[in-house]
Amino acid sequence: MNYYVYILASKRNGTLYVGVTGDLIKRVYEHKRDVRAGFTKRYKVHKLVYFEMTTEIYSALAREKQLKNWKRDWKIGLIEKGNPRWDDLSEKINSLDSGPSTGSG
């Protein structure tokens, strides 16, 4: 099974949210539709700007924790390294099973 660590943004250089999931397509859909009450709904954080994939749940959880502890500037640098225009990557995730291991794409 694949696991994904992802970063959502409200806009370029806006509010950021780091999460982990086993189903990125479903989870991004939930964020965009405000299915669950919480941070992303409150701050309108709906734009998928970065993701990476692993097959190990413990690696995904550790990476999520690591990114959550990073300084904001480091997260922005990570996003801009692979997605300099801060494009919404949610339209590119329909082929995740055969796709790249990062959302830098």
Placement of each model-derived feature along the sequence:
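Short arginine-rich
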Residues: R42, K65-L78
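GIY-YIG nuclease catalytic motif and its immediate N-terminal context
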Residues: M1-A37, K41-M53, Y58-K65, G82-P84, ...
